[in-house]
């Protein structure tokens, strides 16, 4: 199996997808305790660290990781926020690049909101791409929509892929799924069975247990 290290792991959506794709998670890092609890409840065997990624050293993982991934915080670039970009203390693109330099993974994958493609962030975006390429990666960036890949929701996301130069100089994103579905049509009875409809129907239970029903 391929090895991966993921930061900003959240409740584990991306981690579970990578698991299905054949990746063995060496380490998952998440800051929010409730999300960490969800991860641990669903996959007790995973090494989940509930910590600030600024305090994570990638040096112990040098040349041990195939994929370094992370859905770094969206608020700095989201249309729903103030779009402070690099001036937002929650911007973790620099930390992802630092870890890539320390770990030297074969592939780097970064996910963020489509606001990252806004013109106002063009200089910052170019800087990020250049820094990844300076580390020795062929870098590709594209806006993808989860519904085009069989996920029952509209979720456009920017995905940046960096492939180490010594491995290949070509890369292409997967073809789109022409039979995409989203909303009620896509979720059907699965979501009806899994999701509580309102707070009154939700018993008092830990975030981990509630999340476990969804995953």
Regions found by a protein language model. Give the residues of each.
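Conserved SAM-binding strand-loop segment of SAM-dependent methyltransferases
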Residues: 45-52
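Class I S-adenosyl-L-methionine
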Residues: 56-67, 75-215
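Conserved SAM/SAH-binding beta-strand->alpha-helix loop
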Residues: 32-33
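Conserved beta-strand elements of the Class I
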Residues: 3-5
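A short, Lys/Arg-enriched amphipathic alpha-helix followed by its capping loop at the start of a domain
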Residues: 17-25, 42
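Class I SAM-dependent methyltransferase "Motif I" SAM/SAH-binding loop
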Residues: 7-11
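Conserved SAM-binding loop
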Residues: 39
């Amino acid at each position: 199996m391929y090895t991966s290290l993921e930061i900003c792991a959240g409740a584990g959506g991306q981690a579970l997808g990578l698991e299905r794709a054949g990746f063995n998670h060496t380490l998952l890092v998440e800051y929010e305790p409730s999300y960490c609890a969800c991860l641990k409840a669903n996959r007790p065997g995973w090494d989940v660290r509930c910590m600030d990624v600024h305090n994570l050293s990638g040096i112990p993982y040098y040349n041990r990781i195939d994929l370094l991934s992370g859905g770094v915080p969206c608020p700095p670039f989201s249309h729903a926020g103030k779009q402070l970009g690099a001036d937002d203390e929650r911007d973790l693109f620099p930390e992802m690049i630092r870890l890539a330099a320390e770990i030297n993974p074969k592939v780097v994958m970064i996910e963020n909101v489509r606001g990252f493609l806004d013109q106002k962030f063009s200089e910052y975006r170019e800087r990020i791409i250049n820094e990844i390429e300076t580390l020795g990666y062929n870098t590709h960036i594209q806006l993808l929509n989860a519904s085009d890949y069989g996920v029952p929701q509209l979720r456009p996301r920017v995905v940046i892929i960096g492939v180490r130069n010594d491995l290949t100089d070509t890369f292409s994103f997967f073809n789109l799924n022409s039979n995409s579905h989203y909303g009620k049509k896509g979720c059907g009875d699965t979501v009806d069975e899994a999701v509580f409809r309102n707070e009154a129907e939700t018993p008092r239970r830990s975030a981990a247990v509630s999340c476990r029903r969804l995953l």
